[in-house]
């Protein structure tokens, strides 16, 4: 099965907006955390000028950058794993 990078980024942003919103804001500027993941990605794309002809947000490029920022630690030392309760 082929994974859709945009769908992964949408889901990542859904988790990130709840678990580490400050890190997202620090990296991408003020974001409306009440939005859904795909809308947050749209907002990030517009802010970073990751747009296609006509000013349409380039979700593919934005998704790649957001996931790369997470993987490379540019969002900080964060993890998606939830520690077990003691």
Give residue ranges: language-model regions.
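Helix-rich effector regions associated with P-loop NTPase G domains
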Residues: 1-86
